């Protein structure tokens, strides 16, 4: 068994090919494995694609930093969800041209100004995934706050 690394310094991932196409099992020290695959004809659609994982990474990065700051502000968060949409280029490399993230929050005391502040902090300082794609992909963030 591998020892857990200090994730603040180094991240180690492993992928293992599971078939004769592009189906991989990926893991990070100490976490459950995930399946990564591509759509036919290259793959069999048996897992997440790399771009889907990027969207999940960006969403969880923004979500983690936003929730951390909202909680430090003593805000109540009853529900929190992020829906992300990536619009792909049609020419190679067929990565994202733009990404839209929508935060859906239920809270009795979070105001738009609070979210504007934590989104700005996430984008400019605290979300490493966003930092890595900045300048390459247009990222927009919308939000919907409900009090019920």
Q: Could you describe each region identified by the protein language model?
A:
Residues 1-56, 67-148:
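Extended beta-strand/beta-hairpin segments
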Residues 58-62:
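Alpha-helical metal-binding/catalytic segments enriched in His/Glu/Asp
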């Amino acid at each position: 068994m591998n020892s857990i690394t200090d994730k603040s310094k180094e991240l180690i991932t492993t992928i293992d090919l599971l078939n004769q196409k592009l189906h991989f099992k990926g893991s990070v020290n100490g976490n459950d494995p995930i399946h990564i695959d591509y759509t036919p004809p290259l793959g069999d659609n048996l897992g997440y694609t790399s771009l889907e994982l990027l969207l999940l990474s960006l969403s969880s990065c923004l979500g983690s930093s936003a929730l951390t700051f909202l909680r430090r502000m003593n805000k109540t968060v009853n529900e929190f969800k992020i829906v992300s949409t990536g619009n792909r280029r049609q020419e190679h490399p067929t990565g994202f041209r733009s990404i839209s993230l929508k935060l859906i929050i239920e809270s009795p005391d979070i105001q738009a100004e609070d979210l504007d502040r934590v989104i700005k902090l996430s984008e400019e300082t605290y979300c490493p995934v966003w930092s890595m794609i900045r300048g390459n992909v247009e990222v927009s963030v919308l939000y919907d706050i409900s009090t019920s």
